[in-house]
A protein has these predicted regions:
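Ligand-binding pockets and gating/stacking loops
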Residues: 2-362
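A short, hydrophobic C-terminal helix/tail in secreted or cell-surface proteins
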Residues: 363-368
Length: 368
């Protein structure tokens, strides 16, 4: 043995006993074990990302829901026959005459998509739009049609489309809900529009705010406890979850209890993630102006579009935003003009932002 090794062996102060080594490294072993368990828990989570049967063309959805339904013949569905038949009576209705749209349509982009003058900003993205004119409902009434749009049925309780997307693809961010509904209406189907029905409860949407309030004032209620430290909250949650798991063991299997357990854990993780994403103060003035947040007419929906973009970037799988009221039976000119002006600029800004960060091919912005 060389001299250097002899010196090393004789210097007992720099050597650790087996007991000291285990004592000093216990935290490291514990962390390694925790990391392994945590990664396995993430893999086993029902909300973990999953590979679909086919390669998807989009990874997430932003559903822009226009409550009441925009008049298709005045926005994106040009009907030249209405101009030709102006003034003619309808066969099944007396004293009812056909009327063409009072707004001019023009072709835009290389696709030549015809868009009404009511959407001048959105028309600039004509080549990124896909128009589906095949939508219809089984019942000519708003509540049933609204529910059928979201779930596929107005008669039976069915999972919402956001729940199906989350069920099929999982969530990309385990600290955020995979399905978020911003300011949804409480009527016309209510919670069924973002519910999971017979799917496990953790696939239902997380509601933030309601239809009658500005998104700026919306928040997730009871998300945190200002009177309790994070460490103490964790201990309290562990105790509550132990009771929940005992109940689950007795029930053998219950998607509702499993959903409660998962939602409690998610809520604890969301305490820092959600407020940060809903705070637009870190956006520059140019972005806020682009979304119309500096204008009273576009401020509310502009914020929703901006929140949708931020949630999408953070990995939320399905985001629904809502604007209304589009049910213009009377006062069409003023009411439809007002609604289009409130949504045109924010929607165009959302499309522009998604395209700028190469998210257009990954995100499916849907307007209905």
């Amino acid at each position: 043995m060389n001299k250097g090794n002899n010196n090393l062996c004789n210097n007992r102060q720099i050597l650790l006993s087996r007991r000291d080594a285990l004592k000093g490294l216990s935290a490291g072993f514990g962390y390694m074990a925790f990391a392994g368990l945590a990664s396995q828990a993430a893999v086993n989570s029902p909300l973990a990302p999953r590979r679909p049967h086919f390669v998807p063309k989009a990874k997430r959805v932003i559903f822009c829901c226009m409550r009441g339904g925009p008049s298709h013949v005045d926005t994106f569905d040009h009907k030249p026959a209405l101009v030709r038949d102006e003034g003619k009576e309808l066969p099944k209705f007396r004293n009812r005459e056909l009327m063409p749209s009072p707004w001019e349509f023009k072709r835009h982009g290389q696709s030549g998509l015809q868009v009404s003058e009511l959407f001048p900003n959105l028309a600039q993205h004509a080549d990124d739009l896909c128009l589906l004119n095949g939508m219809y409902s089984s019942v000519p009434a708003h509540p049933q049609s609204f529910l059928q749009l979201h779930t596929g049925s107005f008669q039976f309780v069915r999972p919402s489309m956001g729940s199906w997307v989350l069920y099929g693809l999982g969530s990309e961010n385990q600290n955020l809900p995979g399905f978020i509904s911003l300011c949804p209406p409480d009527n016309v189907g209510g919670a069924q529009n973002y519910g999971s029905a017979f799917l496990p409860a953790f696939y239902q949407g997380t509601k933030i705010g309601n239809f009658n309030q500005n998104i700026k004032a919306a928040s997730l209620r009871n998300l945190g406890n200002q009177n309790m430290s994070g460490k103490l909250q964790r201990r309290q949650l562990d105790f509550v979850q132990s009771l929940n798991r005992d109940l689950l063991d007795r029930k053998k299997q219950s998607s509702q209890i499993e959903g409660v357990i998962e939602s409690y854990e998610l809520a604890f993780r969301m305490q820092s993630a959600v407020p940060e994403l809903m705070d637009a103060n870190d956006e520059n003035e140019s972005t806020l102006k682009q979304y119309g947040i500096n204008n009273r007419a576009t401020e509310n929906f502009g914020r929703q579009c901006l929140m949708a973009r931020r949630f999408a970037e953070a990995g939320v799988r399905f985001i629904e935003i809502t604007h209304g009221n589009w049910d213009q039976h009377r006062n069409l000119n003023a009411a439809l003009t007002r609604n289009c002006a409130a949504t045109d600029k924010p929607l165009a800004a959302l499309m522009k932002d998604l395209k700028a960060v190469s998210y257009t091919h990954l995100t499916l912005p849907t307007k209905a």
